[in-house]
Design a protein with these regions (language model features):
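Ribokinase/PfkB-type carbohydrate-kinase core domain
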Residues: 2-142, 148, 155-181
Length: 181
């Protein structure tokens, strides 16, 4: 394929929106994606179509920016940051690591980022650092000592609690505790 200065063209970047079967989301619980394939390519447009299709059938849209992991695929940090931040409002759930903060906001302080993170559809933020796991809604903050809870386990627990995107805004602290423990 064509060699770009920052990435060799690969099949996932060439996946065009018209190739997406929107019906595949009917039985899905969540659509999860990262910044790695959001380059200026057909794949970015395919992600937008997938997000719309998932939203149409009530499927969770989960975005994990993964700035450190995605950086090698991007031509520069500024375009990665701009694109990653532009996709925040598309997600119902943001899955963040402490390593995402500085590349996104120029600070390691989560407090400086929270206001910007709760935009658009975002109703729940799962944030992990080396010591703790935090769950945020627009009205509740809950923290716990680091345990074995992974992002996949969080989504599984949301599913088991029969929690769908339209219910996220009303999550109470007691429900968040069930997700963490």
């Amino acid at each position: 394929g064509e060699t770009l200065p920052y990435r060799t063209r690969s099949s996932e970047l060439c996946y065009a929106p018209e190739q997406l079967d929107a019906g595949a989301f009917r039985d899905a619980f969540a659509l999860c994606f990262s910044s790695a394939c959001l380059l200026d390519s057909p794949a970015r447009l395919t992600h937008l179509k997938a997000i719309a299709a998932a939203r149409d059938v009530g499927t969770f849209v989960c975005y994990a920016p993964r700035m450190t992991e995605s950086a090698p695929f991007w031509p520069d940090a500024a375009s990665l940051r701009e694109t990653a931040r532009a996709f925040f409002p598309q997600a119902d759930v943001l899955l963040l690591k402490s390593s995402d903060l500085f590349p996104l906001f120029g600070s390691h302080e989560l407090r400086t980022a929270l206001f910007a993170l709760f935009s658009g559809h975002v109703q729940l933020i799962f944030y992990s650092d080396s010591e703790n796991i935090h769950l945020f809604t627009r009205s509740v903050l809950l923290s716990a000592a680091k345990n074995d809870l992974t992002e996949a386990e969080l989504l599984y627990r949301l599913c088991r609690l029969n929690t769908w995107p339209d219910k996220l805004a009303g999550l109470r602290e007691s429900t968040l505790r069930k997700l963490l423990f």
